[in-house]
């Protein structure tokens, strides 16, 4: 977060704006569309419009509901009928099944597409699933693609996905095309580097720059976005804004009809001054304006180039952290191939503890609980997290329980990261001693799978 965005959110709350309709929402709805249009133009969508909402899960819900309405227009009035499925990347967010259930599609009708060893949706697997669905008489409403996840920055090659889909549609002479949505609530900030933005960052032009190489790879994976229908944005993740502040951004305004009740169609009159009514297409009627104003201030204050420089510095922070891990040789980085700025690492516990028939998984969870208890009592201690069932190099046969550190501050130095790692290492020794003395028991509670 930055003070200007926090101040903007507080100001909107102080004015107590409800962005339900333009007649009494002031210009909040206009600002909302200015934000969506700005974001859309970063990927070449000159007619982009969108919806400010509360969290990435809602952006996915808007996308899937739009897809269902586009495929099955009568479903807006008559409900869902027939055999319909949505696809989602295996490495994508876990909430898609829940959304399918909430929208009446059914969680069993969310099919996960296996990933390759790069963490991307496998094109061959996608084609096989499309063929299977078609053979079973099912229609594919939407394909939800990962646009950068919290762990491993799983990110599809959008150009390849589009080519696979278009080829299948043409070959089978389908009367429809599956809706393509990019779940880019983390990765959206890299859109600032498209259309020549990367070359405008002087630091990326240094030969052999590892950060620049990752950024180039990310930009290449986003090269097919012109053919997608929508994407998601979380300003509270990588946009320097307070919680919660998300956007569903569509390539055009068709979503306004697709998210309606099926009985109203938008016309040019709806966009005349004072006429826009957001309640016709939003899930909520009570819509605060704090996220809208905060995101607009972020765009005006930092701009496209400023946000691009910010994500570049976060990537540099990752390099500094990785160097500290190698320098201290206390832990082992596991995600060397990630394109993101997060660091997943392994903590080796004392061998005598493992010889007691205690698995690394049990020790890791008990250690994480030990560290959380420290922070809960007010001790100044680094905030890091645990990653159960982590696939090393995206290999389903090589799974462990790992830990996660994500640089969020752009000014941390070598000394800062050395302190962070020393603190974790010192508590590891304390934990092992207490575990031997049976002052710490095994963790019996269930740890959720990684938040993606």
Where are these regions (language model features)?
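Conserved PLP-binding catalytic core of the aspartate aminotransferase-like
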Residues: 332-378, 399
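Short loop-beta-helix segment that forms the pyridoxal 5′-phosphate
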Residues: 37-66, 111-114
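Glycine- and acidic
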Residues: 15-23, 45-51, 80-84, 108-115, ...
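Active-site-adjacent bridging/hinge elements
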Residues: 2-14, 32-44, 102-103, 134, ...
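Active-site C-terminal subdomain of aminotransferase-like
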Residues: 149, 203-337
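A glycine-rich phosphate-binding loop feature that marks nucleotide/adenosyl-phosphate handling sites
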Residues: 182-186, 313-317, 330, 334-344, ...
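N-terminal entrance/gating region of PLP-dependent enzymes' catalytic architecture
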Residues: 1-47, 373-415, 419-424, 442-451
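Conserved PLP-enzyme active-site core in the AAT-like
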Residues: 65-254
């Amino acid at each position: 977060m930055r003070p200007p965005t926090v101040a903007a959110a507080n100001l909107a709350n102080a004015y107590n704006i409800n962005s339900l309709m333009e007649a009494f929402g002031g210009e909040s709805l206009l600002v909302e569309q200015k934000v969506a249009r700005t974001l859309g133009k970063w990927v070449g969508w000159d007619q982009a419009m969108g919806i400010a909402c509360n969290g990435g899960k809602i952006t996915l819900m808007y996308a899937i509901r739009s897809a269902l309405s586009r495929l099955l227009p009568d479903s807006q009035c008559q409900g869902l009928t027939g055999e319909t499925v949505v696809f989602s990347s295996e490495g994508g967010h876990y909430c898609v099944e829940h959304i399918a259930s909430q929208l009446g599609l059914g969680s069993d009708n969310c099919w996960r597409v296996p990933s390759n060893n790069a963490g991307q949706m496998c094109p061959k697997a996608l084609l096989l699933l499309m063929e299977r669905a078609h053979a079973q008489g099912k229609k594919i409403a939407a394909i939800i693609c990962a646009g950068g996840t919290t762990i491993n920055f799983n990110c599809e090659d959008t150009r390849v996905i589009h080519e696979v889909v278009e080829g299948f549609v043409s070959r089978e002479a389908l009367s429809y095309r599956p809706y393509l949505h990019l779940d880019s609530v983390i990765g959206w900030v890299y859109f600032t580097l498209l259309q020549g933005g990367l070359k405008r960052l002087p630091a990326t032009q240094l030969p052999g720059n590892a950060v620049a190489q990752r950024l180039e790879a990310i930009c290449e994976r986003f090269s097919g976005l012109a053919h997608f229908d929508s994407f998601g944005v979380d300003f509270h993740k990588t946009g320097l804004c307070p919680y919660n502040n998300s956007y569903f951004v569509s390539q055009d305004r068709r979503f306004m009809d697709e998210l309606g009740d099926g009985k109203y169609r938008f016309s040019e009159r709806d966009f005349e001054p004072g006429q826009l009514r957001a309640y016709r297409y939003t899930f909520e009627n009570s819509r605060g304006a704090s996220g809208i104003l905060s995101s607009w201030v972020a765009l005006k204050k930092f701009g496209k180039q400023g946000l691009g420089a910010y994500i570049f510095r976060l990537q540099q922070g990752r390099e500094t952290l990785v160097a500290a891990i190698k320098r201290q040789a206390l832990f082992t980085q596991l995600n060397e191939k990630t394109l993101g700025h997060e660091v997943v690492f392994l903590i080796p516990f004392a061998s005598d503890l493992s010889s007691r028939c205690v698995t690394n998984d049990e020790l890791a969870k008990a250690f994480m609980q030990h560290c959380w208890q420290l922070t809960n009592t007010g001790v100044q201690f680094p905030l890091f997290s645990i990653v159960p069932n982590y696939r090393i190099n995206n290999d389903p046969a090589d799974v462990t329980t790992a830990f996660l550190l994500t640089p969020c501050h752009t000014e941390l130095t070598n000394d800062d990261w050395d302190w962070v790692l020393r603190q974790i290492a010192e508590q590891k020794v304390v934990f092992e001693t207490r575990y031997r003395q049976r002052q710490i028991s095994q963790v019996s509670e269930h740890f959720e799978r990684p938040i993606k």
